[in-house]
Each structure stands twice: as C-alpha cells, then as structure tokens.
UniProtKB/Swiss-Prot annotation:
Effect of a null allele: Worms display a small body size, reduced number of progeny produced and partial embryonic lethality due to defects in import of proteins into mitochondria.
Family, similarity comment: Belongs to the small Tim family.
Covalent S-S links between cysteines: 24-48, 28-44
Native species: Caenorhabditis elegans
GO cellular component annotations of the record: mitochondrial inner membrane
Primary localization class, coarse: mitochondrion
Gene3D superfamilies on file: Mitochondrial import inner membrane translocase subunit tim13 like domains
Name this protein carries in UniProt: Mitochondrial import inner membrane translocase subunit Tim9
InterPro entries: Mito_inner_translocase_sub, Tim10-like, Tim10-like_dom_sf
Pfam family for this entry, one: zf-Tim10_DDP
Source domain of life: Eukaryota
Physiological role: Mitochondrial intermembrane chaperone that participates in the import and insertion of multi-pass transmembrane proteins into the mitochondrial inner membrane. May also be required for the transfer of beta-barrel precursors from the TOM complex to the sorting and assembly machinery (SAM complex) of the outer membrane. Acts as a chaperone-like protein that protects the hydrophobic precursors from aggregation and guide them through the mitochondrial intermembrane space.
Amino acid sequence: MTSEQNIQTFRDFLTQYNLVAEQCFNSCVNEFGSRTVSGKEESCANNCLDKFLKMTQRVSQRFQEHQLLNAQANGAAIKVENGGKINKIQ
C-alpha cells in the first residue's frame, strides 16, 4: 500500500469515526447540566457503538459472500465458454 493510500485509508477511518461519534452523541446526550457522563448516557453510547460495529461486521460479511458468489459465477461462465476446459494462463 502506498503512502497516499495509507493517508486516504486513515482519512476514511477518521470520517467514519467522527460520524459514529456524532450520531451516538446526538442520540445519547440530552442534558448538559453536569460535566460528568451519566450512567444512562454511557450505557446508551456503548450500545450505539456496539450496534454500529455489529452492523459493519454484518455488511462486510454479506459483501464477502456476494464477492464469492460473483467469483463462482464468473468461474462457471468461463468453464462454459471454454467448453468445460480450463486453460492454464502462462
């Protein structure tokens, strides 16, 4: 991975992190009467992050399954195209 790709990957991570932090904060913090985080707010934020992580994991898993199915379908199409013979590429 090049330096530019690393920087872009890090930027994408920070963007996603900030979006999740903002969403969870807006959903969970409703009162600003104290500097401390209440137990309810902390629990809500933990649940919010947990849901996001599970959703991300599930989407990633489905994407991998989709990619595998596409690869298998493409492999079957190549076999049919070649009359069932697989030609070795050199």
